[in-house]
Amino acid sequence: MLSRQQGLTAFFGITSIKSQNQTNPTTQVKKHQLNYQQWLDVLKQEAKIAAEKRPPNLSILAGDSLSLWFPLELLPESKNWLNQGISGESSGGLLKRLNLFDQTQPKIIFVMIGINDLIRGISDQVILENYQQIMAELRQMHPDTQIVIQSILPHASENATWEGRDKLLAIPNSRIRQLNRKIQAIATEQGVKYLDLHPLFVNNQGNLRPELTTDGLHLSPQGYLVWSSALQLYSQMELGSKE
């Protein structure tokens, strides 16, 4: 079963999202235990609302649970946000559902995907092929949109409390670094932006900094604050480059 911290937000501007978020998070999690197909239906409906309302400065988060659980209050307030994350998502799964938001008109689409592929034993070659197709399809569907590929984050398997700790232990963070370099190369070839978050999250041993994670895989509030700061800085730099 999959859960969503924010509940079924549909689509609202940042201000409205904050007001929608005053209910007990625990109650929301219990209320919204959904399977994968149910999540697809929810995201399709949310994207439909965004496509109909056509809000200004729309940005989309596309990915897995790391994107899904991004605290709404930490997202840059200069934008309207549509969260298209699903817990446990893989690059292949994301590729198959890009059409869910193909009628929206976002300014930016931020993509982070891949850690669940590694956990499931999917080869780097397949991951890279999926990334290549994701970038190509997003460029075709959204020719006027800036596509931003974000690096796969490291993990902290040694001290992980996540239930799949053994699977994390089998994934060297050095492999993630190498995979990120190849993803960046594909992004460069396709004319897609690449946002390297990886250095912000690693310690001297190349692992996910312990204060930035809740269980060795998922992010803590501090972790999301680091990510949020990177998005803020990126947005400011992009805005400055257009002035």
What kind of feature is each model-predicted range?
Residues L98, Y131-M135, N180:
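Generic structural signal for well-ordered alpha-helices
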Residues Q33-N35, S78-S91, K167, G216:
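Acidic/histidine-rich helix-loop elements
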Residues L68-P76, G92-E129, P154-A160:
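Oxyanion-hole/transition-state-stabilizing segment in secreted/luminal serine hydrolases
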Residues L58-A62, L82:
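Conserved beta-strand elements of the Class I
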Residues I115-N116, R139-N173:
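Active-site segments of SGNH/GDSL-like serine hydrolases
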Residues S157-E243:
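Catalytic His-Asp segment of secreted/periplasmic serine-dependent ester chemistry enzymes
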Residues M1-L58, L72:
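N-terminal secretory targeting modules
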